[in-house]
Amino acid sequence: MANITVKLVRSRYGNTPKQRATLASLGLKKIRQERSFEKTDTLVGMIAKVQHLVEVTES
């Protein structure tokens, strides 16, 4: 499977509680924090919910 790197580029404040919970489940707390994951359908769905807050790169 491919790996995905997710980077938080916008603040989580001012968003809905569901979006904040999604960021927390991705492990993103601070701006410019990055996490790497294996690409799964669940992960892709989570990223779609917060796509305006994160930057995604595939490797």
Swiss-Prot record:
Q: Which cysteines are joined by disulfide bonds?
A: none
Q: Name one GO biological process term.
A: translation
Which PROSITE patterns does this UniProt record tie to the protein?
Answer: RIBOSOMAL_L30 (PS00634)
A molecular function annotated in GO for this UniProt entry is: structural constituent of ribosome
A GO CC annotation given for this chain: large ribosomal subunit
For this UniProt record, give its keywords in alphabetical order, as a comma-separated list. Answer: Ribonucleoprotein, Ribosomal protein
CDD domains to which the protein is assigned, alphabetical:
Ribosomal_L30 (cd01658)
Q: Which domain of life is it from?
A: Bacteria
Classification via InterPro entries: Ribo_uL30_ferredoxin-like_sf, Ribosomal_uL30_bac-type, Ribosomal_uL30_CS, Ribosomal_uL30_ferredoxin-like
Query: What's a Pfam family in this record?
Result: Ribosomal_L30
Q: How does it assemble?
A: Part of the 50S ribosomal subunit.
Entry's family note:
Belongs to the universal ribosomal protein uL30 family.
What's the protein here called?
Large ribosomal subunit protein uL30
Which species is the source of this protein? Solidesulfovibrio magneticus (strain ATCC 700980 / DSM 13731 / RS-1) (Desulfovibrio magneticus)
**Its gene?**
rpmD
